[in-house]
C-alpha cells in the first residue's frame, strides 16, 4: 500500500510522491497523520536546505504533526491503536555529555523526526518512549501539531530570566515571535513587539503585546529609538529576543537592551553568517547574550498542557487549512510571504477539519 508524501530532494526541490506506507518495527508507532502545520524552519529549509535535518535525501519533510495511531510494533506500552496523539520531532539520547548535564537540546546524538507532510508517519522507538503524548478530549489535531513551536518558544522564554514587570522586546512578528510574546505576557512582562507585515502585526495585541511597532518604513536606528521610548528613562529593554534570524537584527537586539540586560538570539541565521556587534556596549554594558536552539521533552509536555488548558490560542496563527495535496502551493505562498502559518490536512481527515475522532 502507498501513501501521499512530500519528499525533500534539495533546496527548492520538494516533490509530492506516492511512497510505501512504512511498517512499525519493535517499539515503533505508525501514525495516520490528521494535521501537519508549516514552520518557518521548513520554509528556510525549502529555500536553502538544512545542515542538521537532512543528511541523506530524499527524505520526508515537515515536523509539526498530530494524528491517530494506525499500527504499533512489538513491545510498545502505554498506547493503543486509535489513540489520538502528538509526536515531538526529536528525542535526546539521555547519556551523552550534555544529556548528563540536563542540556537535552544540545544532545550530541539528538534524534530528529521529519515526514509530517504525509498521510502516515513512522515514529521511532526513542521518540515513542520519550516524546509521544495522547491528546485530551476536545484538543484539535491542528492545535496539537503546534506543540512543537510552542515548546521552542517556551525554551526561549525559560532562558530569558523574565520577571514580572520586566520590559521584553520581541524583534519579529512571525509565528514564533507572537508565541514568544504570548508566553512573556504570561510571565507578567510588559511586551513590545516590532516587526513587518500588516497581517502579522494585526495579531500582536491578541498575543500579548502592549506596544506594537510597525518597522516596515523604519531604519534600524529609528526602531531602536522608538523601542527605547517605551522603556524606563529610555534605558532600553530588560530582555530583547531576536526572532527573525538575520545579522542586522541580531546587532539591533544588542543595541535595544539596557545595561545589565539580556539578549536572546532566538532566530537562527544561515550557517557561516557573521555578526558585527559594538563590543563597548556588550562589555561596559555588561550584557548577557544567549543562543537558543530547539526544545526538550519536558518543555514539549509543558507546551501541550498550555494548549490543552487553552492558555495560548495557537490555532489563531493558522491562516488557512489546505488538503495535503496542496503542499507545494502552500510553500509557494509562504516563500512569497503570503499568510502566517498553514495547516495541511490529509484526505482522510479533510471533512472533519482535523478534530479528534477516536479517544480512549
Model regions and ranges:
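C-terminal hydrophobic helical "lid"/dimerization subdomain
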Residues: 1-5, 228, 251-255, 296-360
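Residues located in well-ordered beta-strands
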Residues: 4, 20, 32, 66-68, ...
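Glycine-rich cofactor phosphate-binding loops and adjacent beta1-alpha1 units
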Residues: 160, 167, 207-287, 328, ...
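NAD(P)H dinucleotide-binding glycine-rich loop of Rossmann-like/cofactor-binding domains
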Residues: 93-171
